[in-house]
Structures are given as structure tokens and as C-alpha cells.
């Protein structure tokens, strides 16, 4: 009888080490080890799925899919079957959203991108454009001129240029402090203002401030009172009314 040179304890230790090495992602490991092992198995299955599943008969695949009903939930049945038995796509394509049709989704995405571009250009378009009729002032360009009320246009469209020197520095500090204090303090007001701006953008579209001001106001000086405009245009009386005034008895 031939006796082995290695003791039994060493043989058991080696076999246990081999078993633990073969199944290291399942025996006494942490959850991320199990997830890495599942990813390895899925990668191996995707690599050899064409050779393995092509040899399987169709009945075996159908029975495997039917048995998966008792193991997974109905809403995850197809996903689990695709993870285990379906082959990976050679050329994956981005999936479309099923919430909206493609035309409506693309149009809404395009309109939102246009609105964001319009908002960014509006924030960056406060460049000074001096008016030739008034050399002491400058006009700030605004693409929302057609959607603002009359009071906001009068208070935001014209700004006096501060004179140079220490007095001009004090005036500019007071001017910028007034601008900061006029900003909305509550988030609900700013959110409502943004929603109104977006609705105005959808209805009117991005137009230049010069076109909006020409449509909303006549081409006159902004400080000219309304009474002077009305004085220049006297109402013309018809000849019948003039005759009635002259022929009336006193």
C-alpha cells in the first residue's frame, strides 16, 4: 500500500483554497465583489452568446423564458431575459423617448434650447449704445422691450452717464446700488418673471430691441411729454361743424 507523502490536512487546505479561488466572488466576499462577478459573467455570456445560444433549440429558449416568470417580476421580465439570454447588439443606438413623439420632443427641445440661448444673449447684451440725439445718455439694449410694461421701460431703458471724477464715482456707486436693490428678493417672483419671459419668447420670438421699441413707441425723444405730442396734432374739424358753430345764435 502506497502512502501519500502529503498529510491529509494539507490536501484539504489546498482543495479549499482552490474552491475559494474558483468561487471568490461568492464565498465570503463583499457585495461589490458579487456585482463584479455578475458583470464578468455577463461579459462572458455576451462574448460567447452567438456560439452557445445558436446551438440551443427554440423550445429550450421558450421554456427558459417561461420559467423566468416565476423568478422575476412582470415589469422586469424582459430586462432580466435580455441580461441573461439575449446577445449584445453589435452597433448600439440611442433609444428614443416613449413619452412624446419624435417631432414634438425635438421641437420642444429645440424651443427650450432657443430660449436658453435667448436668455444668455439677453444677460450678456447690456452693452452701451449711445443715442445720437442725446449725447449725454446711453441706451441699454433689451430684447424684452416688447413684453415689458410702460413703467418698466421708462425706468430701465434710459440711464444717465455719470460724469468723470470723484462725483461721478459716487453717482455710479449710487446708481449700481439702486440697480441691486431693484432686483427681485423672493424666489417666487423671479420664477414668475422667468415663466412670463418664456411665454413671451414663445409668442413673439427673439426680436431686436430696436424693432420692439419702434413698434411700441413713436420715434420721439423719451423725455418729451405726451401733451406736447398732442399739441402738435390739432384735431381737424369738418366744414359742417364749422358752419354749425358760426350759424348758432348767441
Curated annotation (Swiss-Prot):
Compositionally skewed regions (Polar residues) per UniProt: 241-250
Annotated segments matching region Disordered: 86-108, 124-148, 204-250
Signal peptide residue numbers: none
Entry's Gene Ontology cellular component terms: mitochondrion
InterPro entries, alphabetized: GDF5OS (IPR039711)
Presequence positions on this chain: 1-48
Compositional bias per record (Basic and acidic residues), positions renumbered to this chain: 136-146
Compartments, record wording: Mitochondrion
Keyword tags: Mitochondrion, Transit peptide
PANTHER family for the chain: PROTEIN GDF5-AS1, MITOCHONDRIAL, PROTEIN GDF5OS, MITOCHONDRIAL
Protein name from the UniProt record: Protein GDF5-AS1, mitochondrial
Organism: Homo sapiens
Originating gene: GDF5-AS1
